[in-house]
Amino acid sequence: SVAPTNLLVGSTYALSAQVDGGGVSAVQVDSRFGTQSPCANQGVTNWYASGFDSTVGSSAVLSVYNPTATAAVFNVTAFTPGGFSSPASLQGVSVGPHAVLTYNLGAQIVATENFGVQVTVLRGSLVAVGDQISKGVASFNYGTTLLASSATLPLVTTANQAVAQVRIANPGPAPATVTLNVKLGKFKVAPQTTEVGAYRSAMVVITPNTAIPAAGEATIVMKSTQPVDATVVTGTQNGLTSSPVGTPAARVVLADVTGGGFDRAVVTNVAPTATEVSWVLRRRGSLASTGTTSLGANATKSLAVLVGGRAKLTGATLVLTGLAPTLVVSATLVTTPPGVTLTSGLNGG
């Protein structure tokens, strides 16, 4: 691991690593709160993120890094409940070679609880990440390059005293009807539906919600009539964290970087057909165990059960490989109430 704050002075930084041989998955971790974000392996030309908050007690920061040897130019558009905004100061912005820039989004999108952004790169390519502060609680919003009409959101808490929301941004020209089907143990929960106008944002509250009982973690299946970007926001009245909806992959890595362990960890097959999943568990660079399991259509399986106990995931790295890009890995950190800090698996390439 690398702690850049031991190497330089400054409030914001970017880190670029060159790997000689083999391949790696990397993650940035907030050492205080345990929240983390997968690192990118290349710059992109279009990037979306949702669920930002600039109300009193919160701040939303956008950081962009230019990984190339030539200058890059980009625009930023915001999507709010009231419509879209293209702040003049965030149009045609230039980023020098191997330079990093940060912007306080709240200076332009003032006192807005739920908004999304789109970064459009006009020249070159960029790596982008959002940094959301909520009452002193920090989390990373690593966003996405692809909008989705469907997604699976595992491990969404319904615990008492917890907060759970699905925040949605619609960057497209047509309104979207978004339906959330909530799977929660033996309970039958009515679908939660919201309308998201063109170039707008909206929110569905999962917890607290009188239609959804407090019964552990729910799996939510999202369906939308138009491609959208969604973020799960969880926490308590003392602060919230943001977790972008994961993109299914064929190879996913779950790493307990801090050594604090996981409360729950699951793998979900989002395909309508069953698949085989092989796994390799490593601890301190050494092979601990391996195995293979079958995973049914749209099924979720506990990773603790898979490897023989939750304790075996503590301080370890688990690599799961499927037959196609249909796997989503999610985990929750150990918190009170349970499930209020989510973390995602890393794309294993």
Task: Name each region found by the language model.
Residues 12, 57-63, 71-73, 88-90, ...:
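Transmembrane beta-barrel architecture of outer membranes
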Residues 47, 55, 73, 77, ...:
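Solenoidal tandem-repeat scaffolds enriched in leucines and small polar residues
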Residues 1-12, 83-116, 185-215, 219, ...:
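Intrinsically disordered, low-complexity Pro/Gly/Ser/Thr-rich segments with frequent PxxP/GP/PP motifs
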Residues 18, 63-86, 120-122, 162-189, ...:
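Short acidic, flexible loop segments centered on an aromatic residue
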